[in-house]
Every structure is written in structure tokens, then in C-alpha cells.
């Protein structure tokens, strides 16, 4: 299975490099790279794990677009391996392989898995937590509880959204028919204590920054309109159902293409009820399957219901990490007949889809920018802007460009694409990443940037007047050309504020 996951990650890295060749990397990826430039216990909006991993990754690999796609696919490859281990706790190897290939066909694990960020990293840490729970539930030992607590802490260090999954696991432990055995053992209580102790350093950081992530969440995702919340919830449900429909439909196709002769043999075998029941018990661990079913149902229903109750802005991307158990929940249905031929079929479907996409990806990239040059934010040539501003800074001061003051959409790509990797200073946001400050920016000098197309242009220019009164204004226009097709021409208003000395 490690070989399959590695092949999937390698092939889809090649695909994404070609599919995204006409674009700069997503701002979320650049943000994670920026976090990784400085080790902290948190980064304003989120816990630190995504930044730590990005920092480690780019100490090994070059700061290049392809390395970001490789990071995303390496993350998903690890997720596939962990989901394989989860599946083996519930079903036999045949069904477990079917589950993993279904996940590889799930768009989150291929097309939509192009941007490394805390949402994507949850597809490693949440499966690890589920695996630890499925290990602790039957063992009920101190050591299994310790691993469960550490896995929970690791997940919480990825994104606070994982509380959704932690709550689902807690409910599974309370609802499961064998709950008395588990709750009467040391495992769950050791897990709770371990998680609490492991989170102490981060909790201290939260107090030091006055719980700024909660300020961020309340400011950005709290809504006043219940009707608008309901609209977002419907969009979230529809979006994630469509994504799940892809692997489910392809799995159904793989099952339907089993020859009639093999299906008839299965029907004849099922006439021997006692043998049939024994076979069911051999391939599905019903006790563990119940855990999986409960967890998946709770997170599937809990997120939209919670958003409706608390009027929260429910982003479609928040479903990225919540449905990796769906293929297993379906394949673990004991009455499902899974022939060896179905494994060949679904593996063949994966191979055909992957190879066809690999061949077509250069043409898809060229066609997309030709048909809709304003269709993606990444078509704006921020990488060229970063290079030109770096040259402008060096020509004036002959020092490293240390700070960029801009919105996330503009500033984070500067951090990634400039060889100086300046830290981004947020403009009038109370949830600073902590990577720099206005005092440090004024001491070291900075470049402020306003996008002339942004609705917030007046606010950006007002900030520059207030904080960069002595800055040199500079106007730069960038435009990307990809295989003869032009992207949007963007005018950027830059402000070069010199160092204090």
C-alpha cells in the first residue's frame, strides 16, 4: 500500500505541476511557507503544525512551485497509508484496498488537493487520531490511551476545527454498545489527561496573545443572518455531496463490471446462510465498524447543524477533512459482496483517470487561461512583482528586503517568490501572525503594496499614508503570458519605506 500511495503522490504531483503551470501558487500555501520561516507556538489564525512542517519541507526542497505541489501530495499520500491502517482495523485486506483506491479517486485526494494548508494537513492528523481511537477501543490499555491523547493533541495543533472530530469520537465512545468496557478502562481517561498536558505550551501561547485566534474566528466567521447561514449550509452540503459522488459512482461501476458468472457464484454461496454469516464476520469487525459509522454520521451532520445553530459562516473547504471515513463506512457494510475482480476494476479506473489527466494536463492549463484569463487569482503575476520589488529594494539599499505590508492575497506571494522571503505585516488586522510588527517594519524598512483592483484599495492607501508617509511611491504593472495566451494586466501601487537608519 505504501507503493500505491507513493505512486499516487508522484503522478499527481506531475499532474498538478502541469495543470497549475499558468498560475502562481495559492496564497494559503505561501502563508504556510511564511509561517515556516520562524518557529512559533502559533501563527495568529491557526495552531503551528502546518507551519512547522512547511518549514522543515523547504529546508530539504527548493522554494519552487513544484515543491509545494509535492508537499501537498506527500501529505495526501501519508493520509492514504494511514487510512489503509484504519481500514485494516475494520475490514479485511481486500476491502481495505478497495477503500484506499476509492479515496485516491476522491477529488480531495487529487484535483482539489493542490494547496497545502491546515485543512489539507488534517487528512494526516485526523486519520491518525481515528486510528489511535480504533486501537484504544479494543485494547483499553494505558499505553493505547497515551497514544490517543497524543494523536488528539497533534490534531489540535493543526487546526481548532478538529474539535468536530474529537467530539464525534467522544460521542462514538458514549454511544457504542461496548461503551461500558471502554469507559471503565484507563484508556479514555489517560487520553484526556495526555491531551491536556500536551496542549499546555500552546495554551500558554494563546493566553500570551490574548486568544487572538478566537478574535479571528469571531470576526471572520460569525454571522448575523440565519437565512444567509442556511444558504451557506446548503452550499456546503451540495458541494461535499458532489465530491463524494465521484468515488462512490466509480466504485459502483467497478462492482457492476464484475462478470455475471462470478456474481452468480456469490448468490449461490449466500444460500448457505450459516457459512455466509461466518464469512461476513471474518471480513468485517462489526464492533469497529460501528465506531466508524457513528463518527462519520456525527461529523457529517454535526458541522452543518452546528453552523445553523450558532450562525457560523460554513466554508465548503471545511468539509475537506471530514469525509475520509465515508468509503470505509460504505465498504464495511457486511452485506456488500466484494469480488477480487472488483479490485482490479477500481485499480484500472484509477490508472486510466490518472494517466489520462497526466496526458491532458498541459492542454487543460493552456485552454483554461485562453478561455478565462481572469478566472483564477493565480493568473495575476505576483511572482514577477516579487522579483521586480526585490530588485528595486536591493538597488536602493543593498540590504535584504525584510518586511512586506499588504493584504494576504498580495503579501504572502511576496514572501514565497522573493529570494529575500520578507515577513508579511498585516494591515489593520488584530490577528497578526507574530512574524513581524509595525515597529520592526519601520526599523528595517518595508515595501507596502496595494492592488489597484481590490475593493479595499482606499483602506490600503490610507494605511500607507498613515504608516509610510516618507515612502517612495512606485507603480508596477505585471502580466503573465503562458504559451502565447495573456493573463490579466495588473497595476500595483508600491510604497518603498526606507530603513530607520
Where do the PLM segments sit?
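Hydrophobic/aromatic-rich transmembrane helices and adjacent perimembrane loops
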Residues: 39, 290, 294, 310-346
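Membrane-proximal, lumen/periplasm-facing interface regions of secretory-pathway glyco-
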Residues: 22, 312-316, 340-399, 408-423, ...
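Short acidic/glycine- and proline-prone juxtamembrane loop motifs at membrane-interface regions
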Residues: 108-122
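Transmembrane-lumen/periplasm boundary regions of multi-pass, lipid-linked membrane glycan transferases
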Residues: 166-288, 299, 304, 309
Amino acid at each position: 500500500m505504501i507503493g500505491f500511495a507513493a505512486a499516487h503522490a508522484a503522478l499527481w504531483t506531475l499532474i498538478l505541476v502541469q495543470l497549475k503551470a499558468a498560475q502562481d501558487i495559492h496564497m494559503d500555501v505561501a502563508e504556510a511557507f511564511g509561517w515556516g520561516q520562524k518557529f512559533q507556538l502559533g501563527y495568529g489564525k491557526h495552531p503551528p503544525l502546518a507551519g512547522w512542517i512547511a518549514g522543515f519541507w523547504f529546508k530539504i526542497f527548493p522554494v519552487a512551485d513544484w515543491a509545494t505541489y509535492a508537499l501537498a501530495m506527500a501529505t495526501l499520500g501519508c493520509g492514504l497509508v494511514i487510512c489503509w491502517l484504519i481500514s485494516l482495523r475494520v475490514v479485511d485486506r481486500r476491502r481495505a484496498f478497495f477503500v484506499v483506491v476509492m479515496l485516491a479517486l476522491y477529488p480531495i485526494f487529487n484535483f482539489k488537493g493542490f494547496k497545502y494548508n491546515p485543512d489539507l494537513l488534517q487528512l494526516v492528523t485526523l486519520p491518525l487520531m481515528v486510528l489511535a481511537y480504533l486501537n484504544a477501543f479494543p485494547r483499553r490499555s494505558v499505553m493505547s490511551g497515551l497514544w490517543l491523547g497524543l494523536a488528539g493533541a497533534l490534531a489540535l495543533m493543526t487546526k481548532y476545527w478538529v474539535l468536530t472530530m474529537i467530539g464525534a469520537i467522544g460521542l462514538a465512545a458514549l454511544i457504542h454498545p461496548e461503551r461500558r468496557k471502554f469507559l471503565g478502562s484507563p484508556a479514555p481517561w489517560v487520553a484526556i489527561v495526555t491531551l491536556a498536558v500536551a496542549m499546555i505550551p500552546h495554551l500558554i501561547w494563546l493566553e500570551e496573545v490574548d486568544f487572538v485566534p478566537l478574535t479571528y474566528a469571531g470576526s471572520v466567521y460569525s454571522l448575523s443572518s440565519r437565512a444567509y447561514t442556511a444558504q451557506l449550509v446548503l452550499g456546503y452540503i451540495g458541494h461535499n455531496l458532489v465530491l463524494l459522488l465521484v468515488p462512490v459512482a466509480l466504485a459502483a461501476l467497478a462492482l457492476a463490471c464484475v462478470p455475471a458468472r462470478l456474481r452468480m457464484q456469490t448468490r449461490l454461496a449466500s444460500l448457505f446462510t450459516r457459512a455466509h454469516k461466518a464469512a461476513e464476520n471474518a471480513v468485517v469487525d462489526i464492533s469497529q465498524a460501528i465506531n466508524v459509522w457513528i463518527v462519520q454520521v456525527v461529523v457529517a451532520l454535526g458541522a452543518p447543524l452546528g453552523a445553523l445553530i450558532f450562525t457560523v459562516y460554513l466554508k465548503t473547504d471545511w468539509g475537506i477533512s471530514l469525509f475520509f471515513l465515508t468509503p470505509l463506512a460504505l465498504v464495511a457494510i457486511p452485506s456488500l459482496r466484494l469480488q477480487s475482480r472488483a479490485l482490479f476494476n477500481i485499480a484500472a479506473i484509477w490508472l486510466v483517470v490518472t494517466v489520462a489527466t497526466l496526458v491532458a494536463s498541459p492542454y487543460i492549463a493552456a485552454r483554461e487561461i485562453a478561455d478565462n484569463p481572469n478566472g483564477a487569482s493565480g493568473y495575476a503575476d505576483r511572482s514577477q512583482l516579487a522579483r521586480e520589488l526585490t530588485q528595486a529594494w536591493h538597488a536602493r539599499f543593498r540590504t535584504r528586503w525584510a518586511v512586506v505590508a499588504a493584504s494576504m492575497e498580495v503579501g504572502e506571494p511576496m514572501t514565497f517568490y522573493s529570494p529575500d522571503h520578507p515577513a508579511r505585516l498585516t494591515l489593520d488586522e488584530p490577528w497578526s501572525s507574530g512574524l513581524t510588527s509595525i515597529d520592526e517594519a519601520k526599523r528595517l524598512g518595508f515595501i507596502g503594496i496595494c492592488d489597484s483592483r481590490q475593493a479595499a484599495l482606499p483602506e490600503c492607501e490610507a494605511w500607507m499614508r498613515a504608516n509610510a508617509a516618507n515612502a517612495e511611491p512606485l507603480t508596477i504593472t505585471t502580466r503573465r503570458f503562458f504559451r502565447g495566451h495573456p493573463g490579466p494586466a495588473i497595476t500595483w501601487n508600491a510604497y518603498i519605506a526606507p530603513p530607520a537608519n
